[in-house]
């Protein structure tokens, strides 16, 4: 099977896993938003940001270092495994110590215990991360997708059950711990077919390149995490837990799901791009195809949601959350802009150029934090959303000059087309939904479904009749894949 078909087949399995996680995550958010009080939901929202941080730091970029290197020895794998274990213990201790300072800064004393409980992930997760990386490297996403979907399902069930019984934010922590534990146990069992780590005294210089790559990747992830999640602690400190719940509810609808849809493609594309990292022209063509595909998926979903946001919030979360509608609409636009620049990380990892992203993220922190802080003080939760939108516009613009141009050369036309052309394809749907929203002002489930069907139908028709070459190629590839399946 060619790399192209293998990549698309892997994308199918990765999509199934990611969509399962997105659907379960959305259901969990809807259920908990209805059974928890706004204050408890606010505490839970803060912990969700903590979960993202622990997921990001759990292997300190070592997994992607394994994927990035074309040929890696068993001794190098074993050395990286034990480095991961020791780093996990170190991060566990540091998190326990810092938990009190974090809870004090956010003015929520109860956070310290929940953060300490979450820190157990640093002890658990490293035991399975390497096997996960090896499966990704070989594009074996069928097995990996089943493991991740099952693990997330068990965590979802526990979270909802404890939430219904206790009506306490701690339910999410216990569910998260079960998800991580279940995934690690299964990965450790299944992954033994690749190799069994051995204890062998290795010289760090033997894995120096991987450690350096991991360092840049981790530093970049931390800086990127600060840029994308700093709004939550700012809102918590300035406005309080209830507004954190409202902001993060909007954020989890408009920004998080699309950010999980993009990795459906980028997660598979990183190993694929790594295999062609030395062919610059082929790399450029495939990367911009990726940007187009992501825009074709995200633009209609987010811009459509922006128009029917009031109906969505009332029907899904209930009347008590209607105050988040303006915030949700702004974050939908911000989410669409964010997705345009999001896949660049895969390109930089494939080329082992993470130092470019690190420098860029330093620049973004200097710009973003003041913008977000003062916009929140200026206009509360809506101001925070406006600040985030401004930051994403800056990010989309500067990404070309700081990241794309140094790696791919002068490609400004390709970059603009990667979001302008998909936006043009979305316009008929947007215009029709605006007309529907004007003439159908009554909120009901029937009218809500009708708007979705009309908007979705118009967009699918637009894609179907479009003469765009990339769309024709993608339709042909997926048709070929379905026939082979």
Swiss-Prot record:
Topology term for the membrane: Multi-pass membrane protein
Manganese in keyword set: no
Ranges that cross the membrane: 13-33, 38-58, 79-99, 111-131, 160-180, 211-231, 234-254, 297-317, 321-341, 365-385, 388-408, 420-440, 445-465
Alphabetical GO biological process terms: polysaccharide biosynthetic process
Domain of life of the native organism: Bacteria
InterPro entries: Poly_Biosynth_Transport (IPR050833)
UniProtKB keywords: Cell membrane, Exopolysaccharide synthesis, Membrane, Transmembrane, Transmembrane helix
Key word Coiled coil present: no
UniProt subcellular location: Cell membrane
Pfam families, per the entry: Polysacc_synt_3 (PF13440)
Major localization class: membrane
GO cellular component, as recorded: plasma membrane
Family (UniProt): Belongs to the polysaccharide synthase family.
Official protein name in the record: Uncharacterized membrane protein in cps region
Species: Klebsiella pneumoniae
